[in-house]
From Swiss-Prot:
Its main location: secreted. This is Interleukin-22. Pfam families: IL22. Glycans are attached at residues 54, 68, 97. Disulfide bonds join 40-132, 89-178. The gene is Il22. Cytokine that plays a critical role in modulating tissue responses during inflammation. Plays an essential role in the regeneration of epithelial cells to maintain barrier function after injury and for the prevention of further tissue damage. Unlike most of the cytokines, has no effect on immune cells. Signals through a heterodimeric receptor composed of two subunits, the specific receptor IL22RA1 which is present on non-immune cells in many organs and the shared subunit IL10RB. InterPro entries: 4_helix_cytokine-like_core, IL-10_CS, IL-22. GO terms for biological process: negative regulation of inflammatory response; positive regulation of transcription by RNA polymerase II; reactive oxygen species metabolic process.
Amino acid sequence: MAVLQKSMSFSLMGTLAASCLLLIALWAQEANALPVNTRCKLEVSNFQQPYIVNRTFMLAKEASLADNNTDVRLIGEKLFRGVSAKDQCYLMKQVLNFTLEDVLLPQSDRFQPYMQEVVPFLTKLSNQLSSCHISGDDQNIQKNVRRLKETVKKLGESGEIKAIGELDLLFMSLRNACV
């Protein structure tokens, strides 16, 4: 009788272990099938440093004084049109990278001393978002970013100055979308 109980006990344990493994495997498969925004987050502390916040806003203010085109807004409601809230950080990552590469670096000799302090800060944010990807459809995001890039390029140097003048909006949009 004791031998029969032991063999049933081992059989039950084996069945239980196999069931657990099956559940874990199914859970892992389902987790892989879900669309995930990878690391599309920034720490709130990035946006709570008074010195760099001040420098970013001062740079934007100085550039906006040189901006004579008041009819165009680069970072506003149109930029987010058709983009779900969960994908807005990815959108802002794209805008940040464009701003760094195509606007701030070519204009890096202007608006000193703010530029030399703000560019490394924004580069740090860009690096923190480097693994931010979306696995879903990003058609609206790409369309909106392309429209922003085309507007800046069409305006030429004036567009670059406008983009620098909107660094305060970029800063706030990054905080709102990525924290």
